[in-house]
């Protein structure tokens, strides 16, 4: 390529930098995890660590490990050819110094030595920075890095080395549980991408990720658990280069929105203008689909486009794209209207909004490379892989609001399966206060079959409310003997246990009261008392009847006198009813019938003054 072409390309690259510098609120963010010293010289002290942009950070989780220093191989630029042993039962966290070789190689060598995680100690005094992969190369081992790693400040690294040199054991907790903000029950995330499929390894990784993550993304979006937005990086052509061949082939709308041709073949094949045009179309596909409340269709479109309209197969065209749009039932006219005229000297509202997002805001960093994933305004760090990204998204839900897909055993450990998570449980009723969450577990008294349990969730949970006795008898005493059951739980009371009548105790344990022995009942003269479980029997002498409520005996009368008295009462009642019926007929019913007869006869026989004295009919 000629020197003039090189200068033009350099100017285009620097254009973004100029925009970034001029953006008042734009800045780069370092995504961090937390380190806590669990023993040794500064127990409980917390430190920040910068998450590496490769490997697999444990988003939403944590790990505890014993720190080991690499010693004479401190830089870790060559294979250690050994494993680092410690007396601690915890996994090994290898401490390596920064310098000499790239970050990723150090972490790879640490993983090969058996380390569960790697800490890189900075070798200069500076704020934390993000460890990234080499830009001019992409070694094969990058995708094989599976462990988490982080950069720490030089001062903290020096403190760790001194403690280890003194022979102290250093136990650290590496915590990613708050690395992704988790404010509510919906996660908002965005993917900064590019439609160019001939830009090398980065493009291939992006295409593979979209294809593999599509199913999960659509489940989350359809369920209303997430809000997804696609974004595309664009550049600005400097005004002095607007008429150059480079700007004309890489930009639309008179140099306002450009996509660099990484091959720098400005006259052959596809160029940046084609790419930024398709970027805009994909943004419009999402916009139109969202208006139909089917925003997840974007994943179908992009997946199909990568398969059917590939640059490598010379099918990257407007016609191919529009065929996919129509096959998905989207309005082609609305999408064309959204795209507008790419040759017009006007701003495009969709791409203008993209520039604002790209420059970042006060609470989020600037985006300069693709693919970049943002989750709740935090930049995702690590390998762009389906399960790893799902873990990061799941860590963005407020605890106990995550969807079931986040509690799959493939991506999280159910802590309730190990010693019930340290929470209260009732094995008899199979009720537990342990609730599995993506970031761990919570101990919270449950609601079972409409019955609310109350307590601290760790050592105690008791059923509460009207139906509490249906759950393990409300944790109250209950016993059955010879088919007879007594309980100290009452549905009329919302809490507490009270021994029933005939028993004495605290409600958790009740003992039968011997009323006969204590002479609390059957105290009448000549009575004989017999104690039963939960009660007693009392018999009177001389064939008398025992009245329990009064605790007394009454004389039983002879059968003949009783029958005679009963007969007299019945006959008297019958006579009274007959007399009442006769009086009713005589004075009320007869009067009513007389008036009815007068009314009927008046319709057929003329009567004096249209009335007849009722007495004349009596």
Swiss-Prot record:
Keywords: Calcium, Cytoplasmic vesicle, Disulfide bond, EGF-like domain, Glycoprotein, Golgi apparatus, Membrane, Protein transport, Repeat, Signal, Transmembrane, Transmembrane helix, Transport. The keyword tRNA-binding does not apply. Residues 412-462, 465-511, 512-554 form the EGF-like domain. Residues 24-563 are lumenal. Disulfide bonds join 416-434, 423-443, 445-461, 469-489, 476-497, 499-510, 540-553. Vacuolar-sorting receptor (VSR) involved in clathrin-coated vesicles sorting from Golgi apparatus to vacuoles. Belongs to the VSR (BP-80) family. This is Vacuolar-sorting receptor 5. The gene is VSR5.
């Amino acid at each position: 390529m000629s020197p003039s072409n090189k200068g033009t390309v350099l100017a285009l690259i620097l254009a973004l930098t100029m925009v970034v510098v001029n953006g008042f609120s734009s800045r780069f963010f370092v995504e961090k995890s937390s380190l806590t010293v669990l023993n040794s010289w500064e127990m409980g002290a917390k430190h920040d660590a910068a998450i590496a942009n490769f490997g697999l950070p444990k988003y939403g989780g944590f790990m505890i490990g014993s720190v080991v220093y690499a010693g004479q191989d401190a830089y870790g630029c060559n294979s250690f050819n050994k494993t680092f042993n410690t007396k601690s039962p915890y996994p090994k966290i290898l401490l390596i110094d920064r310098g000499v070789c790239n970050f990723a190689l150090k972490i790879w060598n640490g993983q090969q030595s058996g380390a569960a995680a790697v800490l890189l100690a900075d070798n200069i005094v500076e704020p934390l920075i993000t460890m990234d992969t080499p830009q001019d190369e992409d070694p094969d081992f990058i995708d094989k890095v599976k462990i988490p790693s982080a950069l720490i400040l030089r001062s903290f690294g020096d403190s760790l080395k001194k403690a280890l040199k003194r022979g102290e054991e250093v136990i650290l907790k590496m915590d990613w549980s708050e690395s992704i903000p988790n404010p509510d029950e919906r996660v908002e995330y965005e993917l900064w991408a590019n439609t160019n499929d001939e830009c090398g390894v980065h493009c291939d990784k992006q295409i593979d990720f979209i294809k593999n993550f599509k199913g999960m993304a659509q489940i989350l979006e359809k369920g209303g658990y997430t809000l997804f937005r696609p974004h595309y990086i664009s550049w600005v052509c400097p005004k002095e280069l607007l008429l150059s061949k480079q700007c004309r082939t890489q930009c639309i709308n008179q140099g306002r929105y450009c996509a660099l041709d990484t091959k720098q073949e400005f006259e052959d094949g596809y160029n940046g203008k084609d790419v930024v045009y398709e970027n805009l179309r994909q943004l419009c596909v999402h916009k139109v689909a969202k208006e139909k409340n089917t925003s997840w269709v974007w994943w179908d479109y992009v997946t199909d486009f990568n398969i059917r309209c590939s640059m490598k197969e010379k099918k990257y065209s407007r016609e191919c794209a529009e065929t996919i749009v129509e096959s998905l039932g989207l309005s082609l006219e609305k999408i064309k209207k959204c795209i507008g005229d790419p040759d017009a000297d006007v701003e495009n509202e969709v791409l203008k909004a993209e520039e604002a997002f790209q420059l970042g805001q006060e609470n989020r960093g600037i985006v300069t490379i693709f693919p970049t994933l943002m989750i709740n305004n935090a930049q995702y760090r690590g390998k762009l892989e389906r399960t790893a990204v799902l873990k990061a998204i799941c860590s963005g839900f407020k605890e106990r609001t995550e969807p079931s897909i986040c509690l799959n055993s493939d991506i999280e450990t159910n802590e309730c399966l190990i010693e019930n998570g340290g929470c209260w449980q009732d094995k008899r009723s199979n009720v537990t206060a342990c609730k599995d969450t993506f970031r761990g577990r919570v101990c919270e008294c449950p609601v079972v079959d409409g019955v609310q349990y109350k307590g601290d969730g760790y050592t105690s949970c008791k059923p509460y409310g009207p139906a509490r006795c249906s759950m393990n008898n409300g944790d109250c005493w209950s016993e059955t003997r010879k088919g007879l059951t007594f309980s100290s739980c009452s549905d009329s009371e919302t809490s507490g246990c009270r021994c029933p009548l005939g028993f004495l105790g605290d409600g958790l344990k009740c003992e039968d009261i011997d009323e006969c022995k204590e002479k609390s009942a059957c105290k009448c003269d000549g009575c004989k008392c017999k104690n039963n479980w939960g009660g007693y029997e009392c018999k009177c002498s001389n064939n008398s009847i025992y009245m329990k409520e009064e605790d007394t005996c009454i004389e039983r009368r002879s059968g003949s006198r009783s029958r005679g008295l009963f007969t007299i009462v019945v006959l008297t009642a019958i006579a009274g009813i007959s007399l009442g019926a006769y009086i009713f007929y005589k004075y009320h019913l007869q009067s009513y019938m007389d008036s009815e007869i007068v009314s009927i006869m008046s319709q057929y026989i003329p009567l004096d003054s249209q009335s007849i004295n009722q007495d004349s009919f009596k």
